[in-house]
Swiss-Prot record:
Record keywords, A-Z: DNA damage, DNA recombination, DNA repair, DNA-binding
BP terms from Gene Ontology: DNA recombination; double-strand break repair via nonhomologous end joining
Ku domain span: 10-190
Name of the protein: Non-homologous end joining protein Ku
InterPro entries: Ku70/Ku80_beta-barrel_dom, Prok_Ku, SPOC-like_C_dom_sf
GO molecular function, one term: double-stranded DNA binding
Assembly with partners or alone: Homodimer. Interacts with LigD.
SUPFAM superfamilies from the UniProt entry: SPOC domain-like (SSF100939)
Stated role: With LigD forms a non-homologous end joining (NHEJ) DNA repair enzyme, which repairs dsDNA breaks with reduced fidelity. Binds linear dsDNA with 5'- and 3'- overhangs but not closed circular dsDNA nor ssDNA. Recruits and stimulates the ligase activity of LigD.
Length: 267
């Protein structure tokens, strides 16, 4: 069974029911070990005390917050448990919003919400209510040593929860503005036509991580002592004639749509 990252209650009005959270996704990355270049042996991480000038055991380490240079306040795990707010065990629904109202830029992490024993009926009713009203629930939840704003929505006859960034966590200063420039009505028409030609249902199973596949191939080739061939990177020249580039793009998209899609060969 998948690891449970949180257990508690969802509460709205006078109704509450027990739930659990499981991580909905995790990146499928390839992990490399750190090796000593000289003999390719594993390198170990050592915790080192700067004052005593010697290695120490992990059990001797505590958390500390620096209040001024070189002065720390030690914070124990028990201290954090004592100050945990009610949202550490109960998600109180604060409001409901239309499903398209929250900008996806606020989405942080996703979790599956499962019903715990005794909460099946209320869970099913909550899913049905969200489905029928096309609304999502906004609540607060404490886990991983912080309090999150969360969005709970119905998906495939179950509940999914997304933690959200707080407004101050968004780096709005990094946002780019659209350049002030002019384009013709014909250029806009061609751009819209290109969008229409490339519009298709989203099928995530059709996408794959080419970089990961290349790394796996690289590892296998080096294991066999084979030659490593560099992947050719496309060199795109700056667009000089935007109208002509749009026309050619639309034509290429039309041709691609007419051609039957071939099955992708298995790796």
């Amino acid at each position: 069974m998948a690891a449970i990252v949180w257990k508690g209650f969802i509460s709205f009005g006078l109704v509450s029911f027990p739930v659990r959270l499981n991580a909905a996704a995790r990146p499928e990355t390839i992990h490399f070990h750190m090796l000593h270049k000289k003999d390719e042996s594993r390198v170990k991480e050592v915790w080192y005390c700067a004052d005593e000038n010697k290695p120490i055991d992990r059990a001797e380490i505590v958390k500390g917050y620096e209040v001024r240079k070189g002065e720390y306040v030690v914070i124990e795990d028990e201290d954090l448990k004592k100050i945990a707010p009610p949202t550490a065990t109960t998600m109180d629904i604060l409001q409901f919003v239309k499903s398209d109202q929250v900008d996806p830029i606020y989405f942080e992490s996703s979790y599956y919400v499962g019903a715990e024993e005794g909460g099946g009926k209320a869970y099913a009713l909550f899913v049905a209510a969200l489905d029928a009203t096309k609304e999502d629930a906004i609540a607060k939840l404490s886990m991983h040593n912080r309090e999150h704003i969360v969005l709970i929505r119905a998906s495939d006859n179950a509940l999914v929860l997304h933690t959200l960034y707080y407004p101050n966590e968004l780096h709005k200063a990094n946002r780019s503005e659209t350049p002030k420039t002019k384009y013709t009505a014909k250029e806009l028409e061609l751009a819209q036509s290109l969008v229409s030609q490339l519009t298709a249902p989203f099928k995530p199973q059709e996408f794959h991580d080419e970089y990961r596949e290349n790394v796996e191939h690289l590892i296998e080739q080096k294991r066999k002592g084979g030659k490593i061939t560099a992947v050719k990177q496309p060199r795109k020249a700056p667009v000089i004639d935007l109208m002509e580039a749009l026309k050619r793009s639309v034509k290429a998209a039309e041709s691609k749509r007419k051609k039957p899609a071939g099955k992708r060969k298995a790796a």
